[in-house]
């Protein structure tokens, strides 16, 4: 396992310093690599966010194609957050509706780039869609609601293992809703359950229940 970033690891673990905006850095970091998991994201600056989210996705997939790597896990926010806000059980394959939000548009473009490379070069690629990461809860929150598209770190780690173990990705690219909360039933996990065997590792939503 090789970690790559532009910043030092918060716990002092060894990493490769790689700027995803620089193709040569990305390409040289992939020597001897069997699979790539892309968790890059930047939101706060419009110029840099385009370079990281869009150009970065291009550089990664081009480097993957150039080196012959055949497995990629790409990540990003769902493209159904605005238009489908009043629906329930929203499937991952609902038509994308990224709205006019600049960040969502950059991630929409990155997904299309990844999909195009995956199908042209026959790279088995999974796109994991979620809206926020969270540590495992340690106490009852007493909240009246929960964020319905957040995934717990533990669950994402399991989903990544399941994705790496999936030998064949239909049509070389498939997107998956991923979250840790069955309770709200807003975003469907059916596809992830069926193709990956994904289920939340614990009943995380129980931590949201109010005492009566």
Residue ranges of predicted features:
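Conserved C-terminal active-site "lid" loop/helix of NAD(P)H-dependent oxidoreductases
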Residues: 173-199
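Catalytic helix-loop patch of NAD(P)-dependent Rossmann-fold dehydrogenases
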Residues: 87-125
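Glycine-rich NAD(P)-binding loop of the Rossmann-fold in SDR/ketoreductase-type enzymes
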Residues: 18-21, 48-59, 67, 105-106, ...
């Amino acid at each position: 396992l090789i970690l790559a970033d532009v910043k030092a690891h918060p716990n002092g673990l060894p990493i490769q310093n790689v700027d995803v905006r620089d193709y040569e850095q990305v390409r040289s970091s992939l020597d001897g690599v069997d699979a790539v998991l892309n968790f890059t994201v930047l939101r706060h600056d419009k110029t840099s966010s385009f370079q990281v989210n869009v150009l970065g996705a291009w550089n990664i997939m081009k480097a993957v194609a150039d080196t012959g790597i055949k497995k990629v896990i790409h990540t990003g926010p769902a493209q159904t957050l605005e238009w489908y806000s009043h629906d329930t059980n929203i499937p991952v394959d609902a038509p994308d509706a990224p709205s006019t939000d600049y960040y969502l548009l950059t991630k929409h473009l990155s997904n299309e780039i990844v999909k195009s490379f995956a199908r042209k070069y026959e790279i088995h690629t999974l796109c994991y869609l979620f809206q926020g990461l969270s540590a495992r809860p340690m106490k009852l929150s007493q909240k009246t609601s929960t964020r319905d598209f957040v995934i717990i770190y533990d669950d994402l780690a399991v989903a990544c293992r399941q994705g790496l173990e999936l030998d064949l990705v239909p049509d070389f690219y498939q997107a998956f809703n991923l979250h840790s909360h069955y309770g709200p039933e807003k975003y469907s996990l059916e596809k992830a359950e069926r193709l990956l065997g994904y289920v939340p590792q614990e009943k995380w939503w129980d931590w949201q229940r109010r005492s009566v």
